[in-house]
Swiss-Prot record:
Topology of the protein relative to the lipid bilayer: Multi-pass membrane protein
Keyword set, alphabetical order: ATP synthesis, Cell membrane, CF(0), Hydrogen ion transport, Ion transport, Lipid-binding, Membrane, Transmembrane, Transmembrane helix, Transport
Protein name, as recorded: ATP synthase subunit c
Family statement: Belongs to the ATPase C chain family.
Underlying gene: atpE
Function: F(1)F(0) ATP synthase produces ATP from ADP in the presence of a proton or sodium gradient. F-type ATPases consist of two structural domains, F(1) containing the extramembraneous catalytic core and F(0) containing the membrane proton channel, linked together by a central stalk and a peripheral stalk. During catalysis, ATP synthesis in the catalytic domain of F(1) is coupled via a rotary mechanism of the central stalk subunits to proton translocation. Key component of the F(0) channel; it plays a direct role in translocation across the membrane. A homomeric c-ring of between 10-14 subunits forms the central stalk rotor element with the F(1) delta and epsilon subunits.
Stretch forming the signal peptide: none
Domain of life: Bacteria
Primary location recorded for the protein, binned into one broad class: membrane
Spans through the membrane: 5-25, 46-66
Compartments where located: Cell membrane
GO function terms (MF aspect): lipid binding; proton-transporting ATP synthase activity, rotational mechanism
PROSITE patterns, per the entry: ATPASE_C
Amino acid sequence: MSLGVLAAGIAVLSGIGAGVGIGIAAGKAVEAVGRQPEASGRVMTFFILGAALCETTAIYGLVMAFMLMGR
């Protein structure tokens, strides 16, 4: 087995971190809206921004995995 395949598998694991991060952020956003429903628009704005930042780590991991497999 090539070390590139192993490295690509480890790089894809960044998707797990992104999923956990988005899950925690969504839970906290729902909790915040439950406490203050009038602030739901602002909470959702920050949630979407945070989710996008979490998702970039998964995208970078996927790109790195493709680059490592292309060697």
